[in-house]
Amino acid sequence: VDRLVGSEMCIRDSLKKAIMLSFRIYPMDNLSGPYSSWYDKAHLLKGKTANWTKEQHEAAGFRMTPNSPVRPGSFIGKNAVLMPCYVNIGAYIGAGTMMDTFSRAGSCCQIGENCHISAGSGIGGVLEPAQALPTIIEDNVFVGAMSEVVEGVIVGEGSVLSMGCYIGQSTKIVNRSNGEITKGRVPPYSVVVPG
């Protein structure tokens, strides 16, 4: 997201296109490590923090446990905690957010500050398959274990998604107090349960 104009997102399509073009022009390559070897696009094989010193980690200000791949081109805010998780190219993880064990931040998704993305949960990306809008998790959101939020859905500030929620653009979100049905956006300070 380049910026918000009122409540509308302005997307910088040129950046998304540049990332997608990089997949076509860079060759595949091999990288061997202590546990395995990997075969991927050469420019993505080494993670964002490959060869960082202790001082560089301290300056970045986030905690990163072993086996937490963070691809180049992503952003991790201060005081974020990355348990063994996966952060794809272009993803934005806000300050103070926890990416819990085996959670995933998809390409170019936006996760706000002080969020908790619980174990096994996924926040969808925009590159594969190509999507028009990124998935956005606003500040102070809790996403329960084994949940998926995809297809450019926006989860409003302060919301809680219970365990096992699957939310895409076609998912009906029902306001229990008035029966109103929305799609594509979870209103701020909502509590969402599947069913």
PLM regions and their residue ranges:
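Serine/threonine-rich low-complexity intrinsically disordered regions
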Residues: M9-I11, D40, T53, P188-V192
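Generic secondary-structure signature for well-ordered alpha-helical cores
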Residues: M9, R24, M28, G164-G168
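Structural signal for interior beta-strand "rungs" in well-ordered beta-sheet cores
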Residues: E58, F62-P194
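A contiguous, low-structure linker/loop signature
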Residues: L15-G61
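Single conserved hydrophobic/aromatic residue that forms the stacking wall/gate
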Residues: V1-G6, C10
